Amino acid sequence: MKKILLLHMLVFVSATLPISSVASDEVETLKCTIIADAITGNTLYETGECARRVSPCSSFKLPLAIMGFDSGILQSPKSPTWELKPEYNPSPRDRTYKQVYPALWQSDSVVWFSQQLTSRLGVDRFTEYVKKFEYGNQDVSGDSGKHNGLTQSWLMSSLTISPKEQIQFLLRFVAHKLPVSEAAYDMAYATIPQYQAAEGWAVHGKSGSGWLRDNNGKINESRPQGWFVGWAEKNGRQVVFARLEIGKEKSDIPGGSKAREDILVELPVLMGNK
């Protein structure tokens, strides 16, 4: 009886722990897709393990855009334009982006722009927005002992979210039920990248790429993860979707790019049956 009870406890803990708190070699490959009706909230399609939390990575740029426009720090898809400064300490990739405006920030996923936005928001406003949005585990503390939550919490750090929670956030966004201004909705909607899928579907969404961490907390590049989350429209019909993929081998293709291309192919097919 004790063995059975222990087994049930282990299963429960495994199901509720975020992937970032589990060693990367303890997590199998994962692929989740959820599509829900934007009006009713009803799930139209769900497959895979969709309750596990992982880092949102750059898919967090969607809520960041809403925060930026609601706070007035961002004004439109083309304004403001911020110039890169050496003290921003950008990645080698992001050093090529010398001047960035909101639409370019979103389409090209420029990390230093995100970090400058949160720095301008400040800890208190940033934390308040995440809590009001009920976004994932709402933990923006950052890496343990580093006090870097304001600029790092969503980048393979403390903030985690599951595909199911992404859907709940997206449903609130498209229904205008987040505690933000109407202008924030309009500007965020206009800034998020749009893609054309088959069968006349217009897909709006943000990808996010990263990796799991190993037992020592180091990034394990053989465990890529990729998000693509957003909404899609066709002939007055609107759905929200979340796609999460976690692999078991190193890839030259960013995980978010792969998740995006997969959903652009699959969504029209899946919705054709609904």
Curated annotation (Swiss-Prot):
Span of the signal peptide: 1-24
Residue sites binding substrate per the record: 206-208
Residues modified to N6-carboxylysine: 61
Active-site residues from the entry: 58 (acyl-ester intermediate)
Catalytic activity: a beta-lactam + H2O = a substituted beta-amino acid
Record flagged with keyword Signal: yes
Pfam families, sorted: Transpeptidase
GO biological process, one term: antibiotic catabolic process
Matching InterPro entries: Beta-lactam/transpept-like, Beta-lactam_class-D_AS, PCN-bd_Tpept
GO molecular function: beta-lactamase activity; penicillin binding
Gene3D superfamilies: DD-peptidase/beta-lactamase superfamily
Keyword set includes Signal: yes
EC number in record: 3.5.2.6
SUPFAM superfamilies per record: beta-lactamase/transpeptidase-like
Domain of life: Bacteria
Protein keywords: Antibiotic resistance, Hydrolase, Plasmid, Signal, Transposable element
Task of the protein: Oxacillin-hydrolyzing beta-lactamase. Confers resistance to beta-lactam antibiotics but at a significantly lower level than the TEM bla gene product.
UniProt similarity note: Belongs to the class-D beta-lactamase family.
Designated name of the protein: Beta-lactamase OXA-9
